[in-house]
Amino acid sequence: VALKTRESMWLCEAAGFDVVLVETVGVGQSEHQVGSMVDFFLMLLLPGGGDELQGIKKGILELADAIMINKADGESSSLARKTKLHYQSAMSLLASNDFWKSEVHMCSALEQDGIAECWSMMMRYREQGTQRGALERRRAEQNLQWMSQLTDEMLRQQLSDNAEIQQALPMIKEKVSTGTLTPVSAAIDIINMLGSRS
């Protein structure tokens, strides 16, 4: 996830786009970041016997509002059905939110099968979430997270840009690593230097 993904999404919405797609590559930290930015989190997976379920962190599954098993066509159809069953079973163990129970479906991008149903499901989610005020609450929570993230980034940048801090930092690090200064005292000293500049 790029540093300015939220800003890019906000600009797209301001320009009148009512649907903004955010794609990630793989399972990891980026999914958690995107999960705190979007209204609907769709996990797209390939057919597999369910063995890969062990490799997917529970936290990622908890983020998913829906799972689509792609390539559910040709020789992969049977495997896609098995994969769907594995994920339905796993998802049934997770708590649902206040208005939506995560769904698992199959599709074939190659044959354009299941794509319309996927879109219909997302629109159903949007309608239910809007009616219950859940999407508005989710956006408000996301904005608070964004504020915290921006505050952290801006403070880090100020620390990095402060010549006094950068000059003192090697000595402070040396004192912390030798035990002559506690990490807490060091952090307080650095923050005080930042405050003395204003």
Please name every model-derived segment:
Residues 1-3, 48-49, 72-78:
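Flexible beta-alpha connector loops of hexameric P-loop NTPases
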